[in-house]
Swiss-Prot record:
Transmembrane region(s): none
Gene Ontology cellular component list: extracellular region; membrane; other organism cell membrane
Major location (coarse): secreted
Record keywords, A-Z: Amidation, Antibiotic, Antimicrobial, Cleavage on pair of basic residues, Fungicide, Membrane, Secreted, Signal, Target cell membrane, Target membrane
GO biological process: defense response to bacterium; defense response to fungus; killing of cells of another organism
Listed name of the protein: Antimicrobial peptide AcrAP1
Subcellular location(s) per record: Secreted; Target cell membrane
Extra remark beyond the main annotation: Negative results: does not show antimicrobial activity against the Gram-negative bacteria E.coli (MIC>250 uM). Does not show effect on four different human cancer cell lines.
Signal peptide annotation: 1-22
Keyword set includes Cytoplasm: no
Function as written in the Swiss-Prot or TrEMBL entry: Has antimicrobial activity against the Gram-positive bacteria S.aureus (MIC=8 uM) and the yeast C.albicans (MIC=16 uM). Causes hemolysis on horse erythrocytes (64 uM for 100% hemolysis). Minimum bactericidal concentrations have also been tested against S.aureus and is four-fold higher (MBC=32 uM).
Lysine amide found at: 40
Length: 74
C-alpha cells in the first residue's frame, strides 16, 4: 500500500519538475528573444507577414467554398 503512494508522489514530482524545467528553459529564452526583436523592429515585419498569410488563407478558403458549392451533393 505504501509503495503505491510513494510511486504516486514520485510521478507527481517528476511531472512538476519537468514543467518547471520547460518553463525555465523555454519561456525565458523566448521572452528575451521577443524583447530583442521588439527593440530591433522585427516584430512589425513579422506581423505584416502574418496578416498577408491570413489574407491568403481567407482567399483560399473562399475559393474552396465556391468549389464545394459547385460540386453535386450525393
Amino acid at each position: 500500500m505504501e509503495i503505491k503512494y510513494l510511486l504516486t508522489v514520485f510521478l507527481v514530482l517528476l511531472i512538476v519538475s519537468d514543467h518547471c524545467q520547460a518553463f525555465l528553459f523555454s519561456l525565458i529564452p523566448h521572452a528575451i528573444s521577443g524583447l530583442i526583436s521588439a527593440f530591433k523592429g522585427r516584430r512589425k515585419r513579422d506581423l505584416d507577414g502574418q496578416i498577408d498569410r491570413f489574407r491568403n488563407f481567407r482567399k483560399r478558403d473562399a475559393e474552396l467554398e465556391e468549389l464545394l458549392s459547385k460540386l453535386p451533393i450525393y
